[in-house]
Amino acid sequence: MKKIFTILFCVASISASAQNNYSGRYERPLSDVLKSIEKQFHVKIKCDIDTAGKKLPYADFRIRPYSIEETLDNVCKYFDANWWDQGKNTYKLKVYEYARRHTSDGEKMLCWLSAKYNNKEEWEERCNLLRKELRERLEIDAYLDSCLKNAKPQLSKVRKFDGYNVQNICLETLPGEYLYASIYSPAKKGKHALIICPNGHFYEGRYRKDQQQRLATLARMGAICVSYDLYGWGESKREHPNHRTDRAHVIQAMDGLLLLDWMVKNRAKEIDMERIAANGGSGGGSLTVLLSALDERFTAVAPVVSLASHFDGGCPCESGKPIHLSAGGTCNPELLAMMAPKPVLVVSDGGDWTASVPQLEFPYLQRIWGFYGSESNVRNVHLPNERHDFGKNKRQAVYNFFIDVFHLDASKLDEEKVTIEPASSLQTIPMTKE
């Protein structure tokens, strides 16, 4: 028996040795390679990829003793994976994400884009190309052409609160498909600004407290705000349980444009066409940027905790259609720059992918606005000690922006006056068939 064990041990040793030579492609198990890297660079490596049974050829030759980042690059590329620095000498390996890149990649992208235009004329030529290809890749016009033209909406009773009113709307868009929204209006009659407010992937969607606070407060100050469900969220989930689709990408953009059309047509006496905006956070910020690039009626926009040159949006509803391949390649900051020289606010923080905005994306935007001599029209409020949310300071930045550019009534700014309604009150489903 001892002799058998000895033979098996020798065979295993020979086999391992055979792997660690030229004919064996210097192959090593991935799990062992990662342990070696941890030890050599004094780091911790977390894995979201399955390492079981995976082997890395020329493993030791992929290690760059002077750079943990280049080493991880060389390892990850073989397995179609990527790495992310999580701070405190910790790195995470994840499967490749087409919409997410490193900050350094974003910097290279903006440099490449900036070289394409050095004045207003070159920039506007680029805009025309972007606008055309963006619509084609999103397929938005095919969807809009298929929409019902004279569908009669279902409207709830108007609910009256302190300085503002709320009414729900259900609008059939495509045959058998519905858009669900709530309209927050100033109690005072007159011409008002209109703000389309797509929401992101925050818990409870458009029914959450901070969304109601923001829209109601803006309404109290003099803006009509329209909040609508993401495709496959809220009421829409009853019809479309699968939110993470590329179809959601175009439907959500279509819904925003249809709401703008409906409001302008049916409440024309209340809408000041010189004051049309979009404002949303996270995925709602991505949608805000997209809406502004699709429709020139927007006169101001404010994407919150969303904008980055190295992240297109982590959900297919933000990046499922290949819009970022438009015009040879683009990114959300360039799409947002199509608003120039109109007023734009970018709200960013230090706790998510927007941490790079003050040093990277904002200078790029300032350069574009500079082509028009309007650098002051693009603004960045950066909150380095905050995280990914739509908290009070972020809402305050939005209030200040619209008070300035839309001349809202600052004396009405008081979130304590807002009544937080249950989700059921903001839904139209009771009026639709089960």
Language model: regions and residue ranges:
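Sec-dependent N-terminal signal peptides
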Residues: K3-S13
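N-terminal export/assembly leaders
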Residues: A18-Y98
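Alpha/beta-hydrolase-fold serine-hydrolase catalytic core, especially in secreted/extracellular enzymes
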Residues: Y58, P65-I68, W84-Y178, G190, ...
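Flexible loop/turn segments at secondary-structure boundaries
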Residues: E177, F202-G205, W233-S236, G285-T288, ...
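Cap/lid segment of the alpha/beta-hydrolase catalytic domain
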Residues: G190-N266, L307-C317
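Loop/turn elements at helix/coil->beta-strand transitions in domains of secreted/extracellular proteins
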Residues: K191-L194, M221-I224, D272-R275, E296-A300, ...
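Primarily recognizes the serine-hydrolase "nucleophile elbow" in alpha/beta-hydrolase
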Residues: D261-G328
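The feature captures the conserved acid-bearing segment of alpha/beta-hydrolase catalytic domains
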Residues: A300, D312-R367
